[in-house]
Amino acid sequence: MTDARPVGVVVDTMIISWFFDQHPNPVADRYRALIGTRPVLLAFQTVMELRYGALHAGWGELRRRRLERRIAELTVAQPDDEMISICAELRQGCRQVGHPLGDKVHDGDRWIAAAAIRLGLPLASHDGVFAGAPRLELITVAPGP
């Protein structure tokens, strides 16, 4: 029996938005290269942020349906009891070491990180808030601090 590592990458809202966008984006291309052929997964929080962004921007029904079709092509990690506990532990762990994910303003980001930790997968993000978060494996091309 082998210890097979889960396959896939959780991507945050910024990255998946870049992937869904049809405009050329060299940074998005770098993330595509890093992710390669691994399956892309979304946290439920990312789906909420995508839908909110579409509503806030006043997208029409056709464009919102196109977004929903793109989301439906991917696996969405839904919260379960273990993810909820991981999110609480992550907040406490971050608060103890002074990491910004411990702050309330980052509740959404923390859920995305908790989804990646729960699934045992890396998180692809261009957001520096995730750098150095306990238990989180981060894939990024963002410049360091």
Regions found by a protein language model. Name each.
Residues 1-4, 113-145:
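Acidic, PIN/NYN-like endoribonuclease modules and their adjacent C-terminal/linker elements
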Residues 1-42, 52-69:
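Short, well-structured N-terminal submotif of metal-dependent ribonuclease cores
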Residues 2-3, 75-124:
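Active-site neighborhoods of divalent-metal-dependent phosphate/nucleic-acid chemistry enzymes
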Residues 11-12, 43, 105-106, 127, ...:
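Histidine- and aromatic-rich ligand-binding microenvironments
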Residues 12-13, 50, 87, 116:
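Generic structural signal for small/hydrophobic residues in well-ordered secondary structure
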Residues 16, 47-50, 130-131:
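A generic structural signal for short hydrophobic patches within well-formed alpha-helices
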Residues 41, 77, 139:
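General small-molecule cofactor/ligand-binding pocket signal
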Residues 57-61, 94, 140-144:
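Short, hinge-like loop/turn segments at secondary-structure boundaries
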